[in-house]
Amino acid sequence: MLKKLLKMNLFLIIILFFTSAITTAKESPSDEDIDRARKMVKLLDDLYKTFIELITEEYVKNPALLPAATLSKRVFEVMEEKGWHKARLLDATGTPFNPDNNPKDAFERDAINAFAWGNSYIERVENIEGKDYLRAATSLTAVTEGCTICHPGKKVGDLLGAISYTIPLQE
């Protein structure tokens, strides 16, 4: 009788273990989560590129000001410190002013390669340290003559780099 009871308890423990493992297993991000992150990237990209263009216009008038790349990187750092998202400037010229702007992983290298072939957007969902993120990148081109002050040898329309975004998919 005791053996039968122990076997039954062991059986129940095993069932509970597997049931628990199944119910706590991490689900894939939903389409809604991915769509929300895409919209966030679109909004951030518009905001950051507008910021870069406006700062560049002011820098042209007063070169004593900090350049757009320096200010953008600082804004990106503050947003990450506040826990919102991660954004990085990436170099696509092969000769970055700052080596920190070189692509750091496969996604960023793939983005720069895609932009060199004429694409302007790339994305993928990645699991980083157990959490799902939308990784997205958008191309940065010289949009005004002012861009050529810091990017000599480039002209309006030339690819300069990218902004890489890492947006969490679950709250």
Name each model-derived stretch:
Residues 1-11:
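Bacterial N-terminal signal peptides that target proteins for export
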Residues 2, 19-22:
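A broad helix-preferring feature
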Residues 4, 155-156:
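A general structural signal for short secondary-structure junctions and capping/turn motifs
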Residues 9-19:
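Bacterial N-terminal signal peptides
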Residues 23-143, 157-171:
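Extracytoplasmic c-type cytochrome modules immediately beyond a signal peptide or single-pass transmembrane anchor
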Residues 143-154:
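The canonical Cys-X-X-Cys-His
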